[in-house]
Curated annotation (Swiss-Prot):
Signal peptide: none annotated. This is R3H domain-containing protein 2. Residues 32-71, 105-147, 257-376, 401-457, 480-560, 661-725, 738-780 are annotated as: Disordered. Residues 58-71 have a biased composition (Basic residues). Residues 169-232 form the R3H domain. Residues 36-56, 109-143, 257-269 have a biased composition (Basic and acidic residues). It comes from Homo sapiens (Human). Residues 306-317, 401-415, 543-560, 692-714, 759-777 have a biased composition (Low complexity).
Length: 976
């Protein structure tokens, strides 16, 4: 309230003072005729200041603080006190008065009343001046003093506008011309301009004020009306004169600027060139640094890709660093989880058994015990027991197998099998041999195993391969050996859970260091003439372990036994556990027979994985008098050659009497396409002259051939009882087989002889063996793991008296225990026959032909390991044209039907050679006169078609080919 009262009082006082000043000024103008001097003006200013002091004192009354607070409100008083007519265009007062006025306007004061009084005094002085100056119309007075009502200097504004903006210049010139015409027209006192924009109206207002006219807007507010007044004048200078001056000035300035620009351009060019060079240098440095960083970042990926493209590529620097002595966990996993690890080639996968996986298979080693890393040739420490780990994280090193560890399954939650109290203790110290860089021509490494002297710590050694999650090209190896007696681990028989803990049988005596040499041969450099292989001749029966039974699932997730009359126990060897997202390789429970076991597991994604344990009885070891190696072509066990990424595997066994430090070897053969490999076999003292055996059927994309040469350990036992050599293997497929239904499994053959007693055809004839050939005993045959079909029976099985799978290893009986999956040895059932070498193949088989059993046809439950299947069980009397209509399902599977004219005129006759002519013509003759062969694009497609058609109500069946067919001839015939 006090502020408002003070404001009202101040306004009233100001109004009264203004009235008095106006009256005084009017009186003075009436009676004073002379121009006031400077002294009078100064006196008036002093009087005005005194009045202001008195007014301020009367208005304050001790309310300085209140008025200080109300200064923001009192600022409105200025606009009220200032009158628009106060600044008349003809005010040519003294300079001192104008300076005083400008001072009061420019300098803000806390006392608004002082400003108002100054304005009033200014008005009074101007009125006096106007009285003295004679009034003239259209005066030529100087326009430098013209200001707008808002205090803007019109002359300066107009000159600047004329110089700066060409558009406004044209507008101002136009307005000037119209206003001059209006001034010269005495008939009209006002002029109305058309409607225009607000900016142009502002220009018109200022030009009219500059000419001393009244300027207002009409009712619409968009048109300006100007009126002539007594103060109307014509400026001394026209607008065009300012423009001419500006043009001249601009021309001179331009000329000067041109010279300056030229000199500056030279400097700029010099500095620009230097700057350009500097920019180039900096860009090069930045590019080189960024390239160096990118090389450092992506060096690992490029090296991984180089290892993928060539199996002969050496290990990376990080892998070489693992050769330094340090714990195993630091060797195989560096703690950092990588989203992608480069795949391992077959040559570098032996490096410390440290397997790198791709995709989700992230290698991690959690071995808690202290270990040692040794160069090639150093021995392994105490054995260990390891189990396979999860599907997404695979083991690159060793894992301690405690009593609480169980197998983790992905997607298919298979019930885990609890370990027995006889489960092995944690890891002991061990050494893993790392291989140096395997050069392109040759590289080798040694995997050594040394028995432990601690009898109180019985354990088995298993270097676990990782789960293969995505890539089918990955290959891994397992070197397994035992050196101590192991108590029998009794597993309760279960029909639903697969074995999750794997234990290899121990030894009853201390084992000398065993070495396996791994050799790599690039394409075309395999020394065929230097590698000599001999067959095994002495078989021995290998009975299954009594108290050791492995669970066999009857449901989809497990392995299904195919022989009801066989004991569901002692499935010795390997169990391939196939999961939808990864491929795990599990070693099953081996029987604790107290024999020396040394195994090598070679894992191929599209091919079977084989475990080749070589064991000698702990109480009976025969010292051989001479060296008699054995070559087992694993590729021959695969019917019809190899899949796209398959690798033929050859096993060679050398007795310890002839072995030296590097005698055992595992070699890789890089096949150039489907070339044949001559594997000469050196004649032994107990065998007839060698006969060359040819192995082919390797697909062009096959990465290589593996030749493994194993040493048979020595032992202190007498030679009465022969040692036991067991060959067991497992077949499992890659991820591409996930689509197969779990129920599409083979049923066992009706022939008990084919189920219980089957032997495979070896490389050479068992007649070369100097020892007797007892009946080979097979423990059981498995069907496979769902959702992937695993094959049940084997191609070209033999009868109980033919002895094809019985060989002698230095006088030691040998029996091939085909415990779980397809057999390891059947050389004659492979599609290796070339057109010009059929006689040689049949010459080799002719020696075994007399010993063959009549039960050589397994019927519709044949194991499908190749691409070629024979079509059987067609309806009687059906013609070739009608039969072609039945093969639509085969055509949908990608199969190509070939009609081969049988030599004897009988369908499916085995006596004909493999060079039958493929006839693609359509004839009305009977289909029984032909051997109908279906060539599938892959063994997987053949397997799926066989499972689908043999288990359905189709009018024909598919079986494995009873003789060897040249795939190239069949494909060439189908393409014609």
């Amino acid at each position: 309230m006090s502020n408002s009262n003070t404001t009202q009082e101040t306004l009233e006082i100001m109004k009264e003072s203004e009235k008095k000043l106006v009256e005084e000024s009017v009186n003075k103008n009436k009676f004073i005729s002379k121009t006031p001097s400077k002294e009078e003006i100064e006196k008036e200013c002093e009087d005005t200041s005194l009045r202001q002091e008195t007014q301020r004192r009367t208005s304050n009354h001790g309310h300085a603080r209140k008025r200080a607070k109300s200064n923001s409100k009192l600022k409105l008083v200025r606009s009220l006190a200032v009158c628009e007519e106060s600044s008349t265009p003809f005010a040519d007062g003294p300079l001192e008065t104008q300076d005083i006025i400008q001072l009061h306007i420019s300098c803000p004061s806390d006392k608004e009343e002082e400003k108002s009084t100054k304005d009033v005094s200014e008005k009074e002085d101007k009125d006096k001046n106007k009285e003295k100056i004679p009034r003239k119309m259209l005066s030529r007075d100087s326009s430098q003093e013209y200001t707008d009502s808002t205090g803007i200097d019109l002359h300066e504004f107009l000159v600047n506008t004329l110089k700066k903006n060409p558009r406004d210049r044209m507008m101002l010139l136009k307005l000037e011309q119209e206003i001059l015409e209006f001034i010269n027209d005495n008939n009209n006192q006002f002029k109305k301009f058309p409607q225009m924009t607000s900016y142009h109206r502002m220009l018109l207002h200022r030009v009219a004020a500059y000419f001393g006219m009244d300027h207002n807007v009409d009712q619409t507010g968009k048109a300006v009306i100007i009126n002539k007044t007594s103060n109307t004048r014509i400026p001394e200078q026209r607008f065009s004169e300012h423009i001419k001056d500006e043009k001249n000035t601009e021309f001179q300035q331009r000329f000067i600027l041109k010279r300056d620009d030229a000199s500056m351009d030279r400097d700029d060019n010099q500095t620009g060139q230097n700057g350009y060079l500097n920019d180039i240098r900096l860009s090069k440095e930045a590019f080189s640094s960024s390239s160096h960083k990118r090389r450092q970042i992506f060096r690992g990926n490029r090296e991984g890709l180089s290892r993928t493209s060539s199996s002969r590529q050496s290990s990376t620097d990080s892998e070489l660093k693992s050769l330094e002595p340090r714990p195993w966990s630091s060797t195989d996993s560096d703690g950092s989880v990588r989203s992608m690890r480069p795949p391992v080639t077959k040559a570098s996968s032996f490096s410390g058994i440290s397997i790198l996986t791709r995709g989700d298979s992230i290698g991690s080693s959690k071995g808690g015990s202290a270990g040692r890393i040794s160069r090639p040739g150093m021995a392994l420490g105490a054995p260990e027991v390891c189990n396979q780990v999860t599907s997404s994280q695979s083991v690159r090193g060793l894992l301690p197998c405690t009593a609480q560890q169980q197998q983790q399954q992905q997607q298919q939650q298979l019930p885990a099998l609890p370990p027995t109290p006889q489960q092995q203790p944690p890891l002991n110290n061990h050494m893993i041999s790392q291989a140096d860089d395997l050069s392109n021509p040759f590289g080798q490494m040694s995997l050594s195993r040394q028995g432990s002297t601690e009898a109180a710590d019985p354990s088995a050694a298993l270097f676990q391969t990782p789960l293969i999650s995505q890539h089918p090209q990955q290959t891994s190896f397992i070197m397994a050996s035992t050196g101590q007696p192991l108590p029998t681990s009794n597993y309760s028989t279960s029909s639903h859970a697969p074995p999750t803990q794997q234990v290899l049988p121990p030894q009853g005596y201390m084992q000398p260091p065993q070495q396996i040499q791994v050799s790599y041969y690039p394409p075309g450099q395999y020394p065929n003439s230097n590698q000599q292989y001999r067959p095994l001749s002495h078989p021995v029966a290998y009975s299954p372990q009594r108290g050791q039974q492995l669970p066999q699932p009857s449901q989809q997730p497990g392995l299904q036994p195919m022989m009801p009359n066989q004991q569901q126990a002692a499935y010795q060897g390997m169990i391939g556990v196939q999961q939808p997202q990864n491929q795990g390789l599990l070693s099953s429970q081996r029987s604790s027979m107290g024999g020396q076991m040394q195994g090598l597991v070679v894992q191929y994604t599209p091919l079977p994985s084989y475990q080749v344990p070589v064991g000698s009885d702990s109480q009976n070891v025969v010292q051989p008098p001479f060296q008699q190696p054995m070559l087992v072509p694993v590729s021959q066990s695969v019917q019809g050659g190899l899949p796209a990424a398959g690798v033929p595997v050859y096993y060679s066994m050398i007795p310890p009497a002839q072995q030296n430090g590097t005698s055992p070897s595992v070699g890789f053969l890089q096949p150039p396409g489907s070339e044949q490999y001559q594997m000469p076999q050196s004649p032994s003292p107990c065998s007839p002259p060698q006969m060359p055996q040819q192995y082919s059927g390797v697909s062009p994309s096959g990465p290589g051939v593996v030749v493994m040469q194993l040493n048979v350990p020595n032992g202190p036992q007498p030679p009465q009882n022969p040692s036991m050599v067991q060959w067991s293997h497992c077949k499992y497929y890659s991820m591409d087989q996930r689509g197969q239904k779990p129920g599409d499994l083979y049923s066992p053959d009706s022939s008990p002889q084919a189920n219980t007693q089957m032997s495979s055809s070896p490389v050479t004839s068992p007649t070369q063996s100097p020892a007797p050939s007892p009946v080979t005993s097979l423990s059981s045959v498995c069907t496979g793991l769902s959702p992937l079909p695993v094959l049940t029976q084997f191609p070209r099985p033999g009868g109980p008296a033919q002895g094809d799978g019985r060989y002698s290893l230095l006088g030691q009986p040998l029996q091939y225990n085909l415990s779980i999956c397809p057999p390891l040895l059947h050389g004659q059932s492979t599609y290796t026959v070339h057109q010009g070498q059929s006689g040689l193949k049949h010459g080799n088989r002719g020696k075994r032909q007399a010993l063959k059993s009549a039960s050589t046809d397994l019927g519709t439950a044949d194991v499908v390991l190749g691409r070629v299947l024979e079509v059987t069980d067609l309806p009687e009397g059906i013609t070739r044209t009608e039969a072609d209509k039945l093969f639509t399902q085969l055509a949908m599977s990608g199969a190509k039907i070939q009609w081969l004219k049988d030599a004897q005129g009988l369908p499916g006759g085995g006596g004909g050679d493999n060079s039958g002519t493929a006839e693609n013509g359509r004839h009305s003759d009977l289909a029984a006169l032909y051997t109908i062969v279906a060539v599938f694009p892959s063994p997987l497609a053949a397997q799926n078609a066989s499972l689908r058609l043999n288990n359905s109500v189709s009018r024909f069946k598919l079986r494995m080919a009873k003789k060897n067919y040249d795939l190239r001839i069949l494909e060439r015939a189908s393409s014609q």
